[in-house]
Swiss-Prot record:
Name recorded for this polypeptide: ATP-dependent rRNA helicase RRP3
Source organism per UniProt: Coccidioides immitis (strain RS) (Valley fever fungus)
Domain notes: The Q motif is unique to and characteristic of the DEAD box family of RNA helicases and controls ATP binding and hydrolysis.
Positions of short motif DEAD box: 198-201
Described purpose of this protein according to its UniProt entry: ATP-dependent rRNA helicase required for pre-ribosomal RNA processing. Involved in the maturation of the 35S-pre-rRNA and to its cleavage to mature 18S rRNA.
EC number: 3.6.4.13
Subunit structure of this chain's protein: Interacts with the SSU processome.
Recorded name of the encoding gene: RRP3
Domain annotation Helicase ATP-binding: ranges: 79-250
Length: 474
């Protein structure tokens, strides 16, 4: 493909608006299904390149520079339909390439008719919003696309200034976007051409439904809308009926609880009191690999990170009680491999752009099968192999049986010699004592704020402020 010079496109804005130019990815057979209502059913096709899908040369070059050698299934099936001007429902797991599936058609349309406030992407969490924006900017680098990220936890005035610069793409969490729609003078989305709701099931799980309704009421009806979700719940069905026009459904998974064939999953049946020892044994069995360890609480995440560092492991915590800059810093260190172990609550289970994870360890089992699928989906991505281990104690048997039932199979137990494991007990015990001491100091130093590390969770009856809804608690 011939090399491209960096382009700048401009447009003539509507009367009263400032002139605005471009200034500064499952292994099963993909299927297209008919959605309930008036939407159509069409046959899946096979393509070999982004150009075959109808993507223009400059965007194909951007894909090539990012290492996108061939379209993933969700991209191959959804992009041609999007280019035809259809509304879409995309059912795809994390790691299927769905961000590029909606970003490429939007960028191509933007190049054809450039304008400010062209596209809006709604995401459930702050981290995912930043990642989507980064991917838009990377794919649109040759045309200098300009994005604004509008999420909670950041300064409203700075965001209002960014919106005043007339970005082409806005990536936002719903609560903070509605704040700006209600309070930022001169900001509106009346000229919007594209709306994307990413991780729609997660948006609704976080109770963004009423906020989404308010946002939808102020958007122009003449627009293209894409809804992407890992599952098609009744809530998601209601949302698509309210927001999409005659959509096509694109699905790349026939099984709600399907995992990829390149993922090897095992469990370890162990006594609860020895969980830390078995965890260290497993990490020693797979030295140097990139690992995500999932825990259930903020407190356990912090404790395990301290324990692992005391034993010489490059571990870093990620949870919802860290500041926004600390969370982004933790992700950056893990992506760059300056730390190879990420100890995380389920804030990292969905959507985060962590490309090469070799191993997922469920230190604590999730409470439901869907979360298990999202956790282990962090490995064995894009055709690569991966492993997932789950520590199952005497208190977890019922939950584990439910997970296996949802998967439709019993997972093999990973056999270890107990004597070999218990050799580590003295060293682990010393590290545990160190972690207890450091955690105590951490709580004392934070004073009242230390409560944020004491397993704080939002109960079903409790309400979070709109600004906090895009911040993961656990």
């Amino acid at each position: 493909m011939p090399s491209m010079k960096r382009r700048k496109l401009s447009h003539t804005p509507p009367q009263g608006e400032a002139e605005d130019g471009f200034s500064d990815s499952e292994t099963s057979q993909a299927s297209l299904q008919e959605t309930p209502g008036n939407d159509e059913k069409i046959e899946a096709t096979t393509t070999k390149s982004f150009k075959d899908l109808g993507i223009i040369d400059s965007l194909c070059e951007a894909c090539d520079s990012l290492g996108y050698k061939a379209p993933t299934q969700i991209q191959a099936e959804s992009i041609p339909l999007a280019l035809q001007g259809r509304d879409l429902i995309g059912l795809a797991e994390t790691g299927s390439g769905k961000t590029a599936a909606f970003a490429l058609p939007i960028l191509q349309a933007l190049m054809d008719k450039p304008q400010s406030m062209f596209g809006l992407v709604l995401a459930p969490t702050r981290e995912l919003a930043y990642q989507i924006s980064q991917q838009f900017e990377a794919l649109g680098s040759l045309i200098s696309v300009r994005c604004a990220v509008i999420v909670g936890g950041m300064d409203m005035v700075s965001q209002a200034i960014a919106l005043g610069k007339k970005p082409h793409i806005i990536v936002a969490t719903p609560g903070r976007l509605l704040d700006h729609l209600e309070n930022t003078k001169g900001f509106s989305l009346r000229s919007l051409k594209y709306l994307v709701m990413d991780e729609a099931d997660r948006l609704l799980d976080l109770d963004f439904g009423p906020i989404l309704d308010k946002i939808l009421k102020v958007l122009p009806k003449e627009r293209r809308t894409y809804l992407f979700s890992a599952t098609m719940s009744s809530k998601v069905e209601s949302l698509q009926r309210a927001s999409l026009s005659n959509p096509l459904r694109v699905s790349v998974s026939s099984n709600k609880y399907q995992t990829v064939s390149t993922l090897l999953q095992n469990c370890l049946i162990i006594p609860h009191k020895h969980k830390d020892i078995y965890l260290i044994y497993l990490l020693n069995e797979f030295p140097g690999q990139s690992v995500i360890i999932f825990t259930r609480t903020v407190n356990e995440t912090q404790r395990l990170a301290i324990l692992l560092r005391a034993l010489g492991f490059g571990a870093i915590p990620l949870h919802g009680q860290l500041s926004q800059s600390a969370r982004l810093g933790a992700l950056g260190k893990f992506r760059s491999r300056s730390r190879n172990i990420l100890v995380a609550t389920d804030v990292a289970a969905r959507g985060l752009d962590i490309p090469s994870v070799d191993l997922v360890l469920n230190y604590d089992l999730p409470s439901d099968s869907k979360t298990y699928i999202h956790r282990v989906g962090r490995t064995a991505r894009a055709g690569k192999s991966g492993r997932a281990f789950s520590l199952v104690t005497q208190y977890d048997v019922e939950i584990w049986q439910r997970i296996e039932a949802a998967l439709g199979k019993e997972l093999d137990e990973y056999k270890v010699e107990k004597e070999e494991v218990m050799v580590l007990s003295d060293r682990v015990g010393e590290a545990q004592r160190h972690a207890i001491t450091e955690m105590k100091e951490l709580h004392e130093n934070r004073g009242k704020k230390g409560a944020t590390l004491r397993n704080r969770r939002i109960g079903k009856g409790a309400k979070r402020s709109r600004d906090e809804m895009d911040r993961e608690e656990g």
